[in-house]
Amino acid sequence: MVARQLLASGGAWLSLGGTQILLDPGPGSLVQATKRKLDPAKLDAIILSHRHLDHSGDINIMIEAMTDGGRKKRGVVFAPNDALDQDPVILSYLRSFPEKIEILTEGGSYKVNDVSFTTPIKHRHPVETYGFIFRTQHHTFSWVIDTKYFDKLPSYYEGELLIANVVMLNPKVAVDHLSLPEVKMIIEEIKPKIAILTHFGMNMWRARPWELARNLSEETGVSVIAARDGMKFDLARLEGVSPEASSGLARFE
Ligand SMILES: [Zn+2]
């Protein structure tokens, strides 16, 4: 999907009460962001869930863009340790450009302005990988990043909004990714107001994610949305009130 860019792989741009966070800048992140009038020079933080290229491909250029090529020391980069040690995806020469680099660990909590987030559990994935619970002044939402499904996985996440990386249509024992039936179990346990499916593999894509999402809505009673390139989701939808004074969440996967 990434190599052919059947879906864009630039990650997600979180705009939370004035705080700008880029999550998982995969290949094309810079192009997708500027195309959508999102200015990387305004980023407060870049978060990397894990070092795989579909999540990290553009992280170096986005660090450069956030810091005006290193001329302005600003912003924070969050990444697991193995994105920085041997065979690093974050180049050494630009590690002094951001204000700091913070290492993600299991059970960690972090802050960017008045947004906080936690990395509750190390995921089952070939490299060190974390999902996130984000808390703003008004909302809590979880993003379940790549992982093999495991017992109690849903119990680590919470919130009115659940975003899940659904790579596979059906579970495959040998692949460390979530499948649609597993994400259904997560939705049924967390019972968010809204769930967003994203990060589709080829079989998911061929099965028309928007139709799968509609079926899942009927089966679970939770409003399930299939993400699409450039989709913008306003967190005010969780309140059922006017979007004024609220934060928005745009994604460009
Ligand atoms: Zn991965």
PLM region descriptions:
Residues D114-V115, T136, G159-N170:
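Conserved catalytic scaffold of divalent metal-dependent phosphoesterases
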Residues M1-R36, T129-I145, L161:
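Conserved beta-strand hairpin/beta-sheet module of binuclear metal-dependent hydrolase folds
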Residues L22-G26, L43-H50, D54, A79-P80, ...:
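Active-site neighborhood of phospho(di)ester-bond hydrolases with catalytic His/Asp-centered motifs
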